[in-house]
Swiss-Prot record:
NCBIfam families: murG
Protein name from the UniProt record: UDP-N-acetylglucosamine--N-acetylmuramyl-(pentapeptide) pyrophosphoryl-undecaprenol N-acetylglucosamine transferase
Pfam annotation, one family: Glyco_tran_28_C
Membrane topology: Peripheral membrane protein
One example GO MF annotation: UDP-N-acetyl-D-glucosamine:N-acetylmuramoyl-L-alanyl-D-glutamyl-meso-2,6-diaminopimelyl-D-alanyl-D-alanine-diphosphoundecaprenol 4-beta-N-acetylglucosaminlytransferase activity
Organism: Vibrio atlanticus (strain LGP32) (Vibrio splendidus (strain Mel32))
Localization in the cell: Cell inner membrane
Signal peptide location: none
Gene: murG
Keywords tagged on the record: Cell cycle, Cell division, Cell inner membrane, Cell membrane, Cell shape, Cell wall biogenesis/degradation, Glycosyltransferase, Membrane, Peptidoglycan synthesis, Transferase
Catalytic activity: di-trans,octa-cis-undecaprenyl diphospho-N-acetyl-alpha-D-muramoyl-L-alanyl-D-glutamyl-meso-2,6-diaminopimeloyl-D-alanyl-D-alanine + UDP-N-acetyl-alpha-D-glucosamine = di-trans,octa-cis-undecaprenyl diphospho-[N-acetyl-alpha-D-glucosaminyl-(1->4)]-N-acetyl-alpha-D-muramoyl-L-alanyl-D-glutamyl-meso-2,6-diaminopimeloyl-D-alanyl-D-alanine + UDP + H(+)
Protein EC: 2.4.1.227
Length: 353
């Protein structure tokens, strides 16, 4: 009896690492592969991955950035211990290939796989490579990048995006008969973005009628943001902590105001929605670089955080009529790379032969 091939996915910490890993995992599951996950017990993958029917093993590992001297001295021992933990899981399950999607867990897991003679495939979601993937790229059999620039020679494939987002109708079809209020979707990620939560109520008060807003405020921010909109007499708004059906939200929206994390940029492009990006201020400008290609092709606008004011945002939105928004949405969809999950899955299959 032929035994199914096995993939171990290493990804954790944030949705930007976990969701693309799930997209590749689902693609291979549909082809009969067995999937297992390596993560950490105190991050989002611990809850999210089992909900998708995938078993998960845990190792203890933390990031090194921002640690005090005493913790840095202990770091080599903690890393070695994490590698040994990962190697025990790998030895017990015997995967054919290991896929690293980033996050702290990928480092020890990737080294353990390499020491075990198991091929490692990497995917970097951001325009600036994370420290873990920089290290692992030297031992990986195949390296992919979502945006140009993370690695000098890696294949650019985009980010694996959820199937329900990819399946949305083209923006020309979706937006053809729309009239009435311009629909604005505000997203700051699962934790929200304070600057968006503070700025949008003032912006919408300045813009007045003609707009409807759905605002994802993030965990524990909902009531405060509702009060801010009320204090500025803005009624045509729905504020929520989370958006469960992101694809439906993209389908509804005419314009997105959001951060430019790697997964958000890829999803916005795949969905075909015009955007105003307000990048988080990383030292390496990671989020700004993620969004550059959509800005350059006319699919999005960018306001860097130091320049963001309610006045500037209101003036920017006021200049976008329905025709302009449709054009931006179409350009976003044209720029999308919709088969990243297939490309990564095929590379994994080739290495397992």
């Amino acid at each position: 009896m032929k035994q199914n091939k096995k993939l171990l996915v290493m990804a954790g910490g944030t949705g930007g690492h976990v969701f693309p890993g799930l997209a590749v995992a689902k693609k291979l599951q549909q082809q009969g592969w067995e999937i297992r996950w390596l993560g950490t017990a105190d991050r989002m993958e611990a809850d999210l991955v089992p909900k998708h029917g995938i078993e998960i093993d845990f190792i203890k590992v933390k990031g090194l950035r921002g640690q005090g001297v005493s913790k840095l001295i202990k770091a080599p021992f903690q890393i070695i211990n994490a590698i040994l933990q990962a190697r025990r899981h790998i030895k017990a399950w015997q995967p054919d290939v290991v896929l690293g999607m980033g996050g702290y867990v990928s480092g020890p897991g990737g080294i353990a796989a390499w020491l075990s003679g198991i091929p490692v495939v990497l995917h970097e979601q951001n325009a600036v490579a994370g420290l873990t993937n920089q290290w692992l790229s030297k031992i990986a059999k195949k390296v992919f990048q979502a945006f140009p620039g993370a690695f000098p020679t890696a294949e650019v494939v985009g980010n694996p995006v959820r199937e329900d987002v990819v399946a949305l109708a083209d923006p020309e079809q979706r937006m053809a008969e729309r009239d009435g209020d311009i629909r604005i979707l505000v997203m700051g990620g699962s934790q929200g973005a304070k600057i968006l939560n503070d700025t949008l109520p003032v912006t919408m008060a300045q813009l007045g009628e003609g707009f409807t807003v759905v605002h994802q405020a993030g965990k524990n921010n909902q009531q405060q943001v509702i009060e801010q909109y009320k204090s500025h007499s803005v009624d045509n708004v729905q504020v929520t902590e989370f958006i469960d059906d992101v694809a439906q939200a993209y389908e509804w929206a005419d314009l997105l105001v959001c951060r430019s994390g790697a997964l958000t940029v890829s999803e916005v492009s795949a969905a075909g929605v015009g955007s105003i990006f307000v990048p988080f201020m990383h030292k390496d400008r990671q989020q700004a670089l993620n969004a550059d290609h959509l800005v350059e092709c006319g699919a999005a606008l960018m306001i860097e955080q130091p320049q963001l004011t309610a006045d500037k945002l209101a003036n920017t939105i006021a200049q976008l009529d329905r025709n302009e928004l449709k054009m931006m949405a179409t350009k976003a969809r044209q720029a999308a790379k919709l088969d990243a999950d297939v490309t990564v899955a095929e590379a994994i299959k080739a290495l397992a032969k």
